[in-house]
A protein has these predicted regions:
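N-terminally biased helix-coil "hinge/interface" segments that flank
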Residues: 1-398
Length: 398
């Protein structure tokens, strides 16, 4: 009997589950910490979860006929600002240069109240797209700080050839790149440009992750194609995430909604999932997930997805201080900061603690709260710890 495996790479934990293909019966499940800081990135935790699942259940690799991945890597990259600066190349006919320039120009993109995506803009006349001119433009954008390219041409949905020329040159220069026509066939130059920029900003992270995943799982003897879930509940080969990374922005939440529909048989309901890094809230209506176009802050995109609100606050979110007063929570989590939760540490280790502040990652504000002991060991201050300290968590739960 065939086995299907689902693996979810979250911001804090990576989960793997096996079910029988015919009946849908649960065979086994495992949870391991997500390995952000490993040389292989989150792929190491994914492989650890997969290997542990096979060991715990005794499933032979040859019985597996499908492996589907879901991930919050893309949405967490946006929430936490772990994105690549983008160079936007606008293209338009000389006769409409001023209009096309204005509609493709993006100064920066607000990702969260505190984080913006750096964007650098350049414009090319459609009549002057020589390889040399395009290459010079891309090198100039790189010199300004761009690490990925988004190209968006007026009338690109009708004639994508100008965008393809820029993509070819970007590839030759080793730059990850996205074109507006790849993101949508809909009209709306501004929205296509923004969506392409967001996609380009997470291409480096997703390309690295997918490469490590493919290489790592190949060593296990797995012969079936690896698939990934998109935000609209579609499933495609994993290599699609290298090109259309933004389509996986709500991959994790979409998988959760699909699970709720499959196992709870809901007709109408509100779906809430609290993870370690982010919290998802979605709606199920008449037995179907509500669908809409994704918005990033106040920015509309071309990405159609399940209607899920993602908040950068969850069980592992770090508390932030202004002076001695609470200033906020998140988006950084204890896992990203590499700090243990005090409520899971033996009480005898938690003595002579003092409150300090720190920056979880280079470039972060130094206003995240932590506890430090006399030996310099530090512990996170998270919502999970606060709930336990306040007695809100029943004995035996966590």
């Amino acid at each position: 009997m065939g086995i299907r495996v689902g693996i979810d790479v979250g911001g804090t934990f990576t989960k793997a589950v096996a079910i029988e293909s015919a009946s849908g019966a649960l065979v086994g499940k495992v949870t391991v910490p997500t390995t952000h800081h490993a040389p292989e990135g989150v792929a190491r935790g994914l492989v650890e979860a997969f290997s542990s699942l096979l060991q715990r259940t005794g499933i032979a690799v040859g019985r597996i006929d499908l492996v589907v991945l879901s991930t919050t890597q893309a949405v967490n990259a946006l929430l936490e600002g772990d994105v690549a600066p983008v160079g936007v190349v606008g293209i338009g006919p000389r006769a409409h240069r001023k209009e096309a320039f204005r509609r493709t120009r993006i100064d920066s993109v607000q990702l969260t109240p505190e984080r913006r995506l750096p964007v650098f803009h350049a414009f090319l006349d459609a009549e002057e797209l020589s390889e040399e001119r395009v290459a010079d433009t891309l090198r100039t954008l790189m010199a300004r700080g761009a690490r990925a390219i988004a190209v968006s041409a007026a009338y690109g949905v009708e004639d994508p050839e100008p965008e393809r020329r820029v993509l070819d040159v970007a590839t030759a220069l080793g730059l990850p790149a996205t074109a507006g026509h790849e993101m949508s066939g809909l009209y709306g130059l501004e929205v296509r440009t923004l969506t392409a920029a967001v996609n380009a900003s997470i291409l480096p992270r997703m390309a690295e992750t997918t490469r490590w995943v493919e290489q790592s799982l190949a060593t296990s003897g797995l012969q079936v194609p690896l698939m990934i879930m998109h935000g609209d509940l579609a499933v495609s080969p994993l290599e699609e995430a290298r090109r259309l990374a933004a389509s996986t922005i709500l991959s994790g939440p979409a998988a959760s909604v699909a699970g709720a529909l499959l196992y709870h048989k809901l007709l109408d309901g509100l779906f809430i999932e609290v993870g370690g890094t982010s919290t998802n809230v979605g709606v199920i209506r008449q037995g179907r997930p509500v669908m809409k176009y994704v918005r990033i802050m106040d920015h509309p995109t071309c990405l159609r997805s399940v209607d899920v609100r993602v908040a950068g606050v969850a069980g592992g979110s770090l508390v932030r201080l202004r002076g001695r007063k609470l200033a906020g929570v998140g988006p950084r989590s204890a896992h990203i900061a590499g700090l243990p939760y005090p409520c899971f540490v033996p009480p005898e280790m938690l003595s002579n603690l003092r409150l300090v502040t720190l920056a979880p990652r280079p470039g972060d504000p130094e206003d995240y709260a932590a506890l430090e002991d006399d030996e310099g060991r530090r512990y996170a201050v998270t919502l999970t710890d606060a709930a336990n300290a306040l007695g809100l968590v029943p004995e035996g739960d966590y």
